[in-house]
Amino acid sequence: MKLIDYLKTIHTGWKEINIPLENITLKTLDLSLLFREIQLQQGFGTLHTYLVYPLLKRLKDAGFEIDKFYYPFENNLPEKPFILGCKKYFPDSNVVAFQHTAWYNDQLGMFLGSNESEYHPIADKIICSGHIYLNVLGNAGFPKDRLVSGPNLRYTSMYKESSEFNKLVKKPNILLPLTFDNDLAYDLINKVKIVSKEFPQLFVYIRRHPLLNYKELEGFLNEINFSIFEYADEGSMQDWFSNTDIILSTGGSIVIVETVAKGIPLIRIEPDNNFFLDPLACSNYPIKPVNSPDEIINAVK
């Protein structure tokens, strides 16, 4: 990477926050100020995701030849400059994506508008998690001729019987697998702090998502004076499954499905400050989510 790559990325952020947003309405409700606030928050906050584009150029300049790119598909922001860079600098290559998450009805980024697929950066082939998702992703607007039914490559480690993970884990415990959203993390941690007073014997482990703002998370933990925990960032999520007694989640993560598949006690918690992106919402899963600290306490009991 060169200095010019970083300067161009900063310029991209500056252009992003200067895109005019006016007269954005939901029926008669003006949402322009809300969209502007999000625009200012995101303009420079996600610049690191753009660096993959010039990185691909540097790889091309260095003489690399790449026939195929493989990546985990969630239709998130970092995937767009990645696909654009692949097609720009390695036009003869194929981009193959494998589905890495569930599809949530309330997460608009997982759906394409009418004819949006004609210009939206999309992989050449998307390996779906089974035949059901052929219809799910097709109905979400993705080109049906690019969808292929296949195995869920994320779950291959579910069949592993052994692990080299040897961290000394305190028991009994609860694990909080945080997602990409700081607000969801704050809601979960604040409720768990209250609940932990009722169960002092349960040790708390927090697993941070790589897209979280760690500095802001640390500030929140200090603000609420929550310090009796350890981070569970070491090892894979599958490593922690065999060392965890209870998992608590505010949604927005396929870890919920993995937890159920492994037979680990799971408590789904509806957040008070965001949408509840629950991958089990469309299933007949018999245990309903909870919301308040009192409900969580009853669920733990």
Describe each PLM feature range.
Residues M1-K2, L40-L47, L51-P54, D61-S149, ...:
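Active-site-proximal region of nucleotide-activated glycan assembly enzymes
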Residues M1-Y53:
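Conserved N-terminal ligand/cofactor-binding loop architecture of enzyme catalytic domains
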Residues G138-S149, I224, I246, G251-K301:
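Catalytic binding pocket for nucleotide-activated donors in carbohydrate/polymer assembly enzymes
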Residues M1, D67-K68, Y71-N75, K125, S129-H131, N173, P177-D181, F203, ...:
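Structural motif
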Residues L77-G85, D106-F111, V136-A140, Y159-E161, ...:
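A short acidic (Asp/Glu
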